[in-house]
């Protein structure tokens, strides 16, 4: 039986604005035998691992993999939630793979990573939302890479205190949870998420002393004033690091791009973010939550 239970979408690419030149990325490797992208892909395929890089059709895949960095995605490649902007499949997930944490650690060691980002699909079918699976993965990585920085990009876990405690006990170097969009757009963009719930997750983590991080995707119909209000909300709950990037419609069935935000606006928002207290604001059309994540931990222009 096919586990995917997709509802038909009605969006279209026909009325989407034309993609500007600043979003067109090319990356060439003169020596195919030493192509770093192929090296990372082969390692991931060998270990049968999922990455958000591929599952979410990230535009920076080639760039990040050429740096031999990747964001591992736990819990399979089927999400229990369905967001209109996201290219990850939704439906009924398979049971967790108990060997996945060990394989992720083996891949991280083989690639000699110095900054590992671990995220997951939403697993609302699990009592702890997959928190214990995160913990096992962190433990396995630290066995082989004790000096590696570990960033956890977690779902909201429905703000269950028991699940959050499991994450806190991992003691991640960065605690990341993406708000994604402004409050007004949540019902359309992420109907199974709650704006206040996401802020609560970040507030609790900040209060516990963790370096917290969040991200917004622009171009889905928000106004500049709404973005600034959202940034203020994130700063007020203690978020230190912020990423701002351009939304790109994955397929014709996903939410259409409403606007391609010009690079100058991203620059202005970076300045604004610094002015209201963020330690670092990584802002640009191609920026994603884990883009150059190893630099973001200390980035402070």
UniProtKB/Swiss-Prot annotation:
Protein name: Lipoyl synthase
EC numbers on record: 2.8.1.8
SMART domains hit by this protein: Elp3 (SM00729)
Location(s), subcellular: Cytoplasm
Source organism superkingdom: Bacteria
Main location, first listed in the record: cytoplasm
Organism: Leptospira interrogans serogroup Icterohaemorrhagiae serovar Lai (strain 56601)
Annotated pathway: Protein modification; protein lipoylation via endogenous pathway; protein N(6)-(lipoyl)lysine from octanoyl-[acyl-carrier-protein]: step 2/2
Pfam family, one: Radical_SAM
Gene Ontology molecular-function annotations: 4 iron, 4 sulfur cluster binding; lipoate synthase activity; metal ion binding
Residues annotated for [4Fe-4S] cluster 1 binding in this entry: 53, 58, 64, 290
């Amino acid at each position: 039986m096919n586990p995917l239970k997709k509802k038909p979408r009605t969006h279209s690419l026909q009325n989407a604005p034309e993609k500007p030149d600043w979003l067109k990325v090319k990356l060439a490797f003169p020596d195919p035998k030493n192509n770093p992208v192929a090296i990372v892909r082969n390692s991931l395929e060998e270990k049968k691992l999922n990455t958000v890089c591929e599952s979410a059709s990230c535009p920076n895949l080639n760039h990040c993999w050429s740096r031999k960095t990747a964001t591992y995605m736990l819990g399979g490649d089927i999400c229990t939630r369905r967001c209109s902007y996201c290219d990850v499949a939704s439906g009924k997930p398979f049971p967790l793979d108990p060997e996945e944490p060990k394989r992720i650690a083996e891949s991280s060691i083989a690639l000699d990573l110095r900054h590992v980002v671990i995220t997951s699909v939403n697993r609302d079918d699990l009592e702890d939302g997959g928190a214990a699976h995160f913990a096992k993965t962190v433990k396995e990585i630290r066995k082989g890479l004790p000096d590696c920085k570990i960033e956890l990009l977690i779902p909201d876990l429905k703000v269950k205190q028991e699940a959050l405690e499991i994450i806190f006990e991992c003691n991640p170097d960065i605690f990341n949870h993406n708000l994604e969009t402004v409050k007004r757009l949540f019902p359309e963009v992420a109907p199974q998420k709650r704006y206040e719930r996401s802020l609560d997750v970040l507030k609790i983590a900040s209060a516990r002393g963790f370096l917290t991080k969040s991200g917004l995707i622009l171009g889905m119909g928000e106004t500049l004033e709404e973005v600034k209000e959202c940034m203020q909300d994130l700063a007020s709950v203690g978020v230190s690091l912020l990423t701002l990037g351009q939304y790109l419609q994955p397929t014709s069935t996903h939410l259409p791009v409403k606007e391609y935000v010009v690079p100058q606006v991203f620059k202005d928002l970076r300045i604004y973010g610094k002015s209201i207290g963020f330690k670092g604001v990584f802002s640009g059309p191609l920026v994603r939550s884990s883009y150059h994540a190893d630099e973001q931990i200390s980035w402070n222009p």
